[in-house]
């Protein structure tokens, strides 16, 4: 269901999902949504019957750590385990790419979801694009 993005059309599908979720639903400015890290990130896309429904990206921070960013599931596909499957695919990709630690700036409303996946909060709540976030981290192991 989830694939590593390998062509411009797949990347456009990622941007479509992100625009729907972050720009249209959450009010993030469109000019902030696509950033300077797109080309150095590894993107994942999930399709359902040929329609793009979920995406995330990972960005190397150093030799051992990857930052998980832009995690998004289209509204019609939430509450069905899609987010959990997406995060499992993200973690698998990160491990396949040789990373041992994952970090992310999680939206605070999603803290329980990420805690259920064994991410731990670190630091204090901060605002990003007017939305409360907190850093969360996880050691990636082969036992996921």
From Swiss-Prot:
The keyword Isomerase does not apply. Pfam families: Acetyltransf_1. CDD domains: NAT_SF. Residues 1-141 form the N-acetyltransferase domain. Transmembrane segments: none annotated. Keywords: Acyltransferase, Transferase. Belongs to the UPF0039 (ElaA) family. This is Putative acetyltransferase SAR1027. The lineage of its organism: Bacteria, Bacillati, Bacillota, Bacilli, Bacillales.
